[in-house]
Amino acid sequence: MRTVEDRSLEFLIRRDREAELPPLASLCCNYFKQRHWRDAFDDEQASLREELWAVKTQLDTIPMEAYTATRNKLFPLALSGEQQQFSNRAGHKLLESMESTGVWMELSKLLCGKSRKRPRDFAFADVCGGPGAFSQALFKAGRKQGWRHLHGYGMTLAGVSGLDWYNSLLNSPQFTCTYGLDGTGDIFKLSNIDCLVSITKAAPMFLVVADGGFSVDFSVANYQETISSRIMYGQWLAALKLLRKGGCCVLKLFDTFSPLSRAVVYLSCFLYSRVHVAKPRHSRVVNSERYLVCVDFLGYPNEAWGRYLDCFYELGFVDNEHVPELMPREWCLQDEIFMADMRDMNMTVATNQMTALQMILNAASAVEEELKAKETTTRTSAESDDSPLSSRESCKDG
């Protein structure tokens, strides 16, 4: 039987260099086709997606405790709460994604210029970043790289348990946090993104990282990609508005089957010199998480792009239940080079994920029996400890 393990994967996503610039200015900003998140997929790689969903659904029969124990036994690298260097695994995932795609090399080249003795000042933005594992990792890595003049800016939801910035960041003169124009830190509001842009206007913003997302109910876990469409697009747009030319961005994605995800990656190929999708080794092979890594920001091709992408965000997402159409799906599908790379990436990640999930399905019953036996032993031991003292023990106490 085929097996897999947690290891870093990297995919270069290219476009046809002869392809015409997508004419976003020709699209209407007053009306966007809407689909409910349940219906926001198309027939592109539908059989692969449905096969993956079918394997995921089989997990419903496994108790959560048994699933977690089996997963951790088979894939120990990605244990929750790993804190060897950072406060959680997210920091590892960011640095591994940057390493596998050459972001460190690109930033070093950009910052050092002609002189390696005095690196240029460098700022990064951590969007939807609370409690701050990405920022924590970047400061640690920055010290290792010798970037002494590193400054971070962060925006996250205010007043949400678990998303408050780490005290080490709040107390650092190298970190500035904001909660946007209205004080909520809500990235769904374009005005809050623009507030962060205004605050960082004079900063040498060469890196934007975004790890935003939210838990979805187990019953709709297969739709996490489309349910997360709004926050995914908002973070991607924030990077475009924040970055200086030459900068890089790292954005968390889930599955990349939907037309919106595909369009975002395709447009990125016109906005950056190089586009990758990375699956870092600390990102569990059993899940769909991956990272869009864009290198060497070129700027908007024209002002019309900026206006349309803003308009789409502000008017297209009427609520959290529907996903608007960013552009005609044919614009992506007709680019054979781009589609070949996307299909290969989706096939590889999904196939590995299905193999990992099947490994869990095959091993879960034995692990569940081990857990039951352990529970029985623990209960028996506890009952023994609570029993009255034997006559011999009574004499000894006397």
Swiss-Prot record:
Pfam families cross-referenced by the UniProt entry: FtsJ
Keyword annotations: Methyltransferase, mRNA capping, mRNA processing, S-adenosyl-L-methionine, Transferase
Reactions accelerated catalytically: a 5'-end (N(7)-methyl 5'-triphosphoguanosine)-ribonucleoside in mRNA + S-adenosyl-L-methionine = a 5'-end (N(7)-methyl 5'-triphosphoguanosine)-(2'-O-methyl-ribonucleoside) in mRNA + S-adenosyl-L-homocysteine + H(+)
Chain residues that bind S-adenosyl-L-methionine: G132, D211
Keyword Electron transport attached: no
Domain RrmJ-type SAM-dependent 2'-O-MTase: 85-298
Biological process terms in GO annotation: 7-methylguanosine mRNA capping; methylation; mRNA modification; mRNA processing
Record-linked InterPro entries: mRNA_Cap_2O-Ribose_MeTrfase, RNA_MeTrfase_FtsJ_dom, RrmJ-type_MeTrfase, SAM-dependent_MTases_sf
Active site: K252 (proton acceptor)
Annotated EC: 2.1.1.57
Domain of life: Eukaryota
Gene Ontology cellular-component terms listed: cytoplasm; nucleus
Region (Disordered): 371-398
Gene3D superfamilies to which the protein is assigned, alphabetical: 3.40.50.12760
GO molecular function, one term: mRNA (nucleoside-2'-O-)-methyltransferase activity
Biological role stated in the UniProt entry: S-adenosyl-L-methionine-dependent methyltransferase that mediates RNA cap1 2'-O-ribose methylation to the 5'-cap structure of RNAs. Methylates the ribose of the first nucleotide of a m(7)GpppG-capped mRNA to produce m(7)GpppNmp (cap1).
Protein name: Cap-specific mRNA (nucleoside-2'-O-)-methyltransferase 1
Species of provenance: Leishmania braziliensis
